[in-house]
A protein has these predicted regions:
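Hydrophobic alpha-helical transmembrane segments
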Residues: 118-121
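Beta-strand->loop->alpha-helix junctions that form or flank phosphate-binding loops
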Residues: 55-86, 142-145, 158, 259-262
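Flexible active-site lid/hinge loop adjacent to a nucleotide/diphosphate
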Residues: 1-68
Length: 315
């Protein structure tokens, strides 16, 4: 269990994070007696699932010195298994025995450790496979071979550099995911470079979630292209963009930097056509395949000489 964040709330009677945690805890409770339940020690909601978890408990944590703090310390004292990020390595503990599995910098999907969410994924994957007896050399080789490329993981941190522009395609469709992506963007952006973002969220999320996406986007991007999916999931056309724009503008972001477009193709093209060397474009697609093809066409053609940004009256 990686974490519990505020997504899908307001759907099917799940109104709070505590409600969602109770639903997710069914997975932990259903683990067979001889199985292993892998939990994130850094997330309070996930940590609380340990009380009712089935099978043998396995912890993972990205905190420094996690092996010497609770709940991992007492777990290891009783001979348990834990995987932690320690001294730049993925470290596996079995009781007091420590094994360095792989350097985090050697895991391509973490981008040298900059993509902290993929560090968490690597820790969780190591915990799960090590608990099942997979040799650490095999785990290290697998983590070293798996990338965040479109071929390995479509729509999950796919990166392409073209014409001096870095393009990132990632399905960050909720506030927690956008927050994590924003941390990475802050680390990768070049001095003096702009960051363009194509941003959206499914229409069946709460109004407050849509507004929060706009607030978060304003703190990450210099130019925002809000767009809507073909299926509004019960919302009228334009209403999703309106709420996200409301959030962005509430932060004091200039209205000239907030754009509302009808679809993701137009939003993608607007970002790519106006980016210049040193800029970054972050695309959050619904049609992952179609948008990736569009990005590749951008890479294969000469950059357009466009000076103005699109008008706001797109939808």
């Amino acid at each position: 269990m990686l974490n519990v964040t505020a997504d899908h709330l307001g759907l099917k009677g799940i109104d709070t994070i505590a409600d969602l945690a109770r639903v997710k805890s069914v997975v932990a409770e259903s683990v067979a007696r001889r199985g292993h339940c892998v939990l994130n020690a850094d997330d309070p909601m996930t940590r609380s699932m340990a009380r009712h978890a089935g099978g043998h408990l396995v912890w993972f944590s990205a905190r420094d010195a996690a092996a010497t703090t609770e709940p991992i310390r007492s777990h290891l004292a009783n001979g348990g298994i834990a995987v932690v990020s320690e001294a730049g390595e993925v470290a596996l503990y079995r009781g007091s025995d420590r094994t360095a599995v792989v350097a985090i910098a050697a895991i391509p999907a973490t981008l040298g450790g900059a993509a902290d969410f993929n560090v968490f994924n690597a820790l969780a994957a190591t915990a799960m496979t090590a608990a099942h007896g997979i040799p650490t050399k095999t785990i290290a080789a697998a983590l070293g071979a798996f990338t965040s490329s479109f071929e390995d993981s479509p729509g999950r941190l796919n990166i392409l550099d073209a014409h001096g522009v870095r393009v990132i395609v990632d399905y960050a469709h909720n506030p927690a995911a956008l927050t994590a992506l924003g941390r990475l963007v802050a680390k990768l952006r070049k001095t003096g470079g702009r960051v363009f973002g194509m941003v959206s969220i499914p229409g069946d999320r709460r109004d407050c979630d849509l507004i929060e996406m706009g607030v978060l986007a304003a703190g990450i991007f210099d130019q925002i292209m809000f767009r809507e999916a073909p299926d509004g999931r019960g919302r009228t056309a334009g209403s999703i963009n309106a709420l996200m724009s409301q959030g962005a503008l509430s932060t004091g972001m200039r209205s000239a930097d907030v754009h509302r477009l009808v679809d993701e193709e137009a939003a993608t093209d607007a970002c790519l056509e106006h980016a210049r060397p040193g800029d970054m474009v972050v695309l959050m697609p619904t049609d992952v395949d179609g948008i990736w093809q569009r990005v590749n066409r951008f890479a294969e053609t000469a950059p357009n000489q466009v000076t103005g940004l699109p008008e706001r009256a797109y939808g």
